[in-house]
Amino acid sequence: MLQLTPSAAQEIKRLQHSRQLTRHHFRLAVRPGGCAGWLYHLDFVPEITADDLEYESGGVTVLVDSQSAGYLHNLKLDYAEDLMGGGFRFTNPNAAQVCSCSLSFAPNLEKNL
């Protein structure tokens, strides 16, 4: 299960509306890359695939492909603004290590096998 904070859900809806993607779905995935090995990938996509799992949180449907699901189980996605601007913040109980940028992580392999 994924959890979006109210501020994350509000920002996703704002982005979707401002980009005129109201018929698109919000996708959260992980991809190889970054200094810790895996990067979070956020996107709006026009279609749901057969491989997608759907989660509902904060009035937002979140699509997760089956390969990313184990890495994102119980993830909390927040959105916050500070002096440097706004950005999504990830709290991932499946991460053994998180890069200082907080956008890249190394998975706890025992949890994700």
Swiss-Prot record:
Q: Which InterPro entries match?
A: FeS_biogenesis, FeS_cluster_insertion, FeS_cluster_insertion_CS, HesB-like_dom_sf
Residue span of the signal peptide, if any?
Answer: none
Q: What terms describe the molecular function in GO for this protein?
A: 2 iron, 2 sulfur cluster binding
The UniProt entry's GO CC annotations, sorted and at most eight, read: cytoplasm
GO biological process annotation, one example: iron-sulfur cluster assembly
SUPFAM superfamilies per record = HesB-like domain
Membrane-crossing residues?
none
Sequence similarity: Belongs to the HesB/IscA family.
**PANTHER family for this protein:** IRON-SULFUR CLUSTER ASSEMBLY 2 HOMOLOG, MITOCHONDRIAL
Q: What is this protein called?
A: Uncharacterized protein slr1565
Q: Which organism is it from?
A: Synechocystis sp. (strain ATCC 27184 / PCC 6803 / Kazusa)
